[in-house]
């Protein structure tokens, strides 16, 4: 089984995370049960996500295959710089994850914000984002890789996942020293 965590997809509403904050502040539901995703959608939302994570909440960045496009055309906070900024603000990196919306619908826009059509999210963006964290933002590899391995496994309470440890599933990606994918082993 897995934990009863509610994954909340955030949009461009000016209310940002107001309703999530109210649930955590006004009910018995702990922040650990709500995982807001797409927290890097825009600067205002990202700043609210820092506040939420500083209070112990978990936050999820959306990784992208075309990193430059989403930062420049869509005004998203680049994942590597966002994680670096969160850490500089004092957020425990154990509260940060990156997900891909892998195989989900992905709206595409031009420089004017006009809708161009639909694409497909790629899970391959996860490794690309980890590489950027390490190579462009100087985030230690063990922290960067934990955002797609041990952190989500712990937050979602996925037994036997997210670590290289006796008794765990041997799900491994073998990487080169340049962080290029060389081999995948599932349930080794």
Place the predicted regions along the sequence by residue:
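Residue-level "edge-of-site" marker
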Residues: 65, 147, 180
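Residue-level recognition of conserved beta-strand edge/terminus positions
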Residues: 62, 173-176
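A cross-kingdom feature marking charged/low-complexity
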Residues: 176-184
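Glycine-centered positions in the ABC transporter ATPase nucleotide-binding domain
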Residues: 187-188
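His/Asp/Glu-enriched, well-ordered alpha-helical/loop segment
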Residues: 88-168, 172-174
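Active-site core of metal-dependent hydrolases
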Residues: 1-109, 115-116
């Amino acid at each position: 089984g897995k934990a009863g965590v509610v994954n909340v997809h955030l949009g461009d509403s000016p209310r940002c995370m107001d309703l999530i904050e109210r649930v955590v502040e006004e009910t018995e539901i702990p922040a650990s049960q709500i995982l807001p995703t797409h927290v890097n959608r825009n600067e205002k939302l990202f700043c609210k996500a820092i506040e939420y994570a500083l209070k112990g909440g978990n936050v999820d960045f959306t990784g992208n295959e075309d990193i430059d496009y989403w930062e420049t055309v869509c005004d998203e906070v680049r994942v590597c710089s966002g994680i670096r900024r969160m850490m500089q603000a004092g957020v425990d990196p154990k509260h940060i994850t990156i997900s891909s919306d892998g195989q989900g619908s992905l709206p595409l826009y031009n420089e004017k914000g006009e809708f161009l059509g639909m694409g497909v999210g790629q899970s391959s963006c996860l490794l690309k984002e980890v590489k950027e964290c390490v190579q462009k933002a100087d985030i230690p590899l063990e922290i960067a890789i934990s955002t797609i391995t041990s952190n989500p496994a712990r937050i979602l309470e996925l037994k036997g996942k997210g670590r290289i440890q006796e008794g765990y599933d041997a799900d491994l990606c073998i990487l080169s020293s340049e962080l290029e994918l060389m081999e995948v082993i599932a349930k080794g």
